[in-house]
Each structure stands twice: as C-alpha cells, then as structure tokens.
Amino acid sequence: LPAPKNLVVSRVTEDSARLSWTAPNAAFDSFGIAYYEYVSYGEAIVLTVPGSERSYDLTGLKPGTEYFVYIQGVKGGIPSEPLSAIFTT
C-alpha cells in the first residue's frame, strides 16, 4: 500500500504537537502512529486513529526534546509504507 502523504508537524509547544496528513477518502481503515525520543531511541508510543481522521494532537511530550514520528495507513490489516518526520518541542 502507498503511504499517506504530506505529514506536517505544526502547533508545536513544549509538551504537544499536531500531526496532519493527507490520504484519499476511504483509502484506509485506520492509521497507526508511533513516536519516540529521537536521540535516546526511547520506547515508542504507538496509537491508532480512525481512517477518517487527517490530524492528531500528540500530548504529554517533554520540553526541548527531539522526536521521531511516523504514520502508516492500514487497510484490511495490511500496513502501508511509513511516512515519517522529526520535530523538536
């Protein structure tokens, strides 16, 4: 499956950030999002959002920390290629 497109990280504060992306309507049943502290390769936090969503707010982040985040679309239990970004709070 092709990955979702145009992953943008916006509204970054000391402890939160908004993710937004694009994908064709009904292309995916859900999206899997994973993120972790980039430098320390901390344990990834993994979550799932409905396939109708095109944004998600990450909360509870650490100030002054670089994060790696990626998103995959899921259709019929099969994940797409990942789309990733790096951002700093």
Q: Can you describe what each PLM-predicted range is?
A:
Residues L1-T59, E66-T89:
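Extracellular low-complexity, O-glycosylation-prone stalks/linkers
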